[in-house]
Amino acid sequence: MYSQRFGTVQREVKGPTPKVVIVRSKPPKGQGAEHHLERIRRSHQKHNAILASIKSSERDRLKAEWDQHNDCKILDSLVRARIKDAVQGFIINIEERRNKLRELLALEENEYFTEMQLKKETIEEKKDRMREKTKLLKEKNEKERQDFVAEKLDQQFRERCEELRVELLSIHQKKVCEERKAQIAFNEELSRQKLVEEQMFSKLWEEDRLAKEKREAQEARRQKELMENTRLGLNAQITSIKAQRQATQLLKEEEARLVESNNAQIKHENEQDMLKKQKAKQETRTILQKALQERIEHIQQEYRDEQDLNMKLVQRALQDLQEEADKKKQKREDMIREQKIYHKYLAQRREEEKAQEKEFDRILEEDKAKKLAEKDKELRLEKEARRQLVDEVMCTRKLQVQEKLQREAKEQEERAMEQKHINESLKELNCEEKENFARRQRLAQEYRKQLQMQIAYQQQSQEAEKEEKRREFEAGVAANKMCLDKVQEVLSTHQVLPQNIHPMRKACPSKLPP
């Protein structure tokens, strides 16, 4: 249990001096089964707590989903009720407005009938009013026709004017040429910048490589110095160990000589008293031999400890040297791998740039082909629209001629009817009584005056039509002049639409000419 908590612990602990070693006591043995059961019980408690937490969270989630579902249903029903109320209110409002409108129309109709009954126009006033209304309608129709023709002419001028199209095409071609030149210059500038960047990266890579070589040389010198210092330290330790060993040997020899001299002296002193002191000599010899044996064992133990320490130091030094060599080899392999990755990255970058150039050229070619196709399509559409416009103009002109012929035939029919009415009136006048001759003569004179006024009105209408045709001709001349002026104005104020801007101008607007 102790080793599981704190890891493997060495029992031997070095003291303040080289020959002092403290042995750590063994940790007490724990109750393995009880700890295992306790661990299983804790794991079951954690598992049950996790299951309870999962069930609680699932219950909370279901409750939240149910509350959200109920809220959505309540909101849906509330919205449906409000929409239904709004629709009903709208329908009721529409019905009320319809009823008010019906009442208003009925009221206006009643007022109109009342006014007509109160007014009781005569036939002559009604004819004058109808003539005035006809004149106003003719003027209104003529004005609408002129506005429509002007609008169509302006639209035809803006969309299908050949001179304007040629001028705009020339301007567009010039701009395309200028933008292509600017694009070529921009690509050359990009290539130059890429070349400068590659040179800079090569220079930085060379500097980095030289710095790495310098660091490796310094590291090698440092490792060499460290190995030399380690070797000198090991030699010094071996020398000190040999000196200690020689001192120990000399001490053993000195002790042996001392023991021998003591034994000889004791033997010489106790030769006569051997029988009396034999027991004491035997005890003294035993004590001395035991002390000598303990001293020899202690010296041998110290020698073995020193040998083990020296072997550990040598192994540690060799291990450090091996680790340094492995690190150096790993660094060299990392540097070679980084060089390979960098070269691979440069090759991939060149391939990507070539692919981008090819893709860019392909996009330009597709854009050019698309623009040519669009221009051809526009030309075809313009020709078709021009033909349709000519057909429409011819149809309109034909309809105008037919309307004019119908109008003239109707006028002739009206004149014939009027002449017929005149003849009938004259016959009626001849059939009337003599006493009403003066009155009939006066009425005939008034009617003759009205006919003269109608003839004068018709002559004025014909002169007005001639004047209108002359004005139309002058308006056509002025429109032609305005067309030419408008062409110059459009050319002077022409701007490229946003959808026709070149992609390079959108990408780099500050590096291209305006």
Curated annotation (Swiss-Prot):
Ranges annotated as spanning the membrane: none
GO biological process terms held by the UniProt record: cilium assembly; cilium movement; determination of left/right symmetry; epithelial cilium movement involved in determination of left/right asymmetry; flagellated sperm motility; manchette assembly; sperm flagellum assembly
GO cellular component, one term: cilium
Location(s), subcellular: Cytoplasm, Cytoskeleton, Cilium axoneme; Cytoplasm, Cytoskeleton, Flagellum axoneme; Cytoplasm, Cytoskeleton, Microtubule organizing center, Centrosome, Centriole; Cytoplasm, Cytoskeleton, Microtubule organizing center, Centrosome, Centriolar satellite
Broad class of where this protein is predominantly found: cytoplasm
Residue ranges the record marks as coiled coil: 91-148, 203-474
Tissue expression from the record: Expressed in skin fibroblasts (at protein level). Expressed in nasal respiratory epithelial cells (at protein level). Expressed in airway epithelial cells.
Keyword annotations of the record: Cell projection, Ciliopathy, Cilium, Cilium biogenesis/degradation, Coiled coil, Cytoplasm, Cytoskeleton, Developmental protein, Differentiation, Disease variant, Flagellum, Heterotaxy, Spermatogenesis
Free-text function comment from the UniProt entry: Microtubule inner protein (MIP) part of the dynein-decorated doublet microtubules (DMTs) in cilia axoneme, which is required for motile cilia beating. Regulates motility patterns of both 9+0 and 9+2 motile cilia through differential localization and recruitment of axonemal dynein components. Required for centriolar satellite integrity and non-motile cilium assembly. Required for motile cilium formation. Through its role in the beating of primary cilia, involved in the establishment of organ laterality during embryogenesis.
Disease: Heterotaxy, visceral, 6, autosomal: A form of visceral heterotaxy, a complex disorder due to disruption of the normal left-right asymmetry of the thoracoabdominal organs. Visceral heterotaxy or situs ambiguus results in randomization of the placement of visceral organs, including the heart, lungs, liver, spleen, and stomach. The organs are oriented randomly with respect to the left-right axis and with respect to one another. It can be associated with a variety of congenital defects including cardiac malformations.
Family: Belongs to the CFAP53 family.
Name assigned to this protein: Cilia- and flagella-associated protein 53
